[in-house]
Regions:
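ATP/NTP phosphate-donor binding region
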Residues: 1-65
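Nucleotide donor/acceptor-binding cores
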Residues: 3-6, 85, 257
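Catalytic core of DAGKc-family lipid kinases
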Residues: 33, 42, 80-193
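Short Gly/Thr/Asp-enriched flexible loops that form oxyanion-binding sites at enzyme active sites
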Residues: 70-82
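Gly/Ser/Thr-rich active-site loops/lids in small-molecule metabolic enzymes
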Residues: 153-161, 201, 205-230
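A generic structural signal for short beta-strands and their flanking turns/coil linkers
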Residues: 174-176, 190-192, 216-221, 255-259
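ATP/nucleoside-binding phosphotransfer catalytic cores, i.e., glycine-rich phosphate-binding loops
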Residues: 182, 214, 224-264
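Phosphate-binding core of ATP-grasp and ATP-grasp-like enzymes
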Residues: 195-206, 242-245
Length: 264
């Protein structure tokens, strides 16, 4: 009987302040389940893509260990393969939005048990030009906060680190004049933020109604936030988003399978 192989792609900087013991517990569960286990750590940005692409065809299961970014990179690497393994996820990042959408436990051992005994499911994968994504592609306000929030702050503060960094953006909000064609519908306007996502949460800052987000329907959710003209407009937008009222205050919310975006 041929022993099945499982590869863990581990981002060691994700959740650095979290105890490492549970990761060893997860690895032990995989070994006890009969898998020949390999562990590869990322050392620089983009490593997860390379590791997944180089090793993915020679394994039965690839498990991404890190935050949403690590998962996204792992998927990007796997999408380059003709024969793709099964994918698992042990969330170790600061926000883990996509894991929450999938109801994956934040405890590594419990998440490993879900991988071993849970139901397999299909997921929509987005393609933006030549890049793949499973979680979100976005532009505008607050998008820089996920990149500029210091790793130490994200490890220590989690969601709060993104919120604090996002608040800095409020002083430098600038709208984007765009022309967007989504499934044949043309949208012209000035927007503060836009996202194409497959998650019930974006960057730990915005929540979408779980009843309106389906992760395997062949469509992503498009959210556009118009540029406010007055402080009152901004307040109304925030309230509409908090209350998930996507048909108010000029908000655009659609389920789309394809789109073309032009900016000025």
């Amino acid at each position: 009987m041929v022993q099945k192989k499982l590869l863990m792609i581990v981002n060691p900087t994700a959740g650095r302040s979290k105890p490492r013991g549970p990761l060893f517990d997860a690895a032990a569960l995989f070994s006890q389940a009969g898998y020949l286990l390999s562990i590869r750590q990322t050392e620089s940005p983009g490593d997860a893509i390379k590791i997944a692409a180089e090793c993915g065809e020679d394994t039965d299961v690839v498990v991404a260990v890190g935050g949403d970014g690590t998962l996204n990179q792992t998927i990007s690497g796997l999408m380059s393969l003709e024969q793709r393994p099964l994918l698992g996820y042990l969330p170790r990042g600061s926000t883990n939005d996509f894991a929450a959408s999938l109801h994956i436990s934040s405890d590594p051992a419990a998440a490993a048990d879900q991988i071993l005994h849970g139901q397999r499911r299909a997921l929509d994968i987005g393609r933006w030009n030549e890049r793949y994504f499973v979680y979100v592609a976005s532009f505008g306000a607050f998008t820089r906060s996920s990149y500029t929030a210091p790793q130490a702050a994200k490890n220590a503060l989690g969601h709060l680190a993104y919120i604090l960094e996002g608040m800095k953006d409020l002083n430098s909000l600038r709208p984007y004049q765009i022309r967007l064609t989504a499934d044949g519908e043309v949208l012209d306007g000035s927007y503060l933020f836009g996202a194409v996502c497959n998650s019930t949460s974006i960057g730990g800052l915005m929540k979408l109604n779980p009843e309106r987000v389906v992760l395997d329907d062949g469509k992503f959710e498009l959210l556009l936030i118009p540029s406010p003209r007055t402080p009152q407009d901004l307040q109304n937008l925030v309230l509409a988003l908090l209350n998930q009222q996507y048909d108010r205050e000029g908000l655009v919310f659609r389920h789309v399978s394809s789109l073309h975006l032009e900016t000025q």
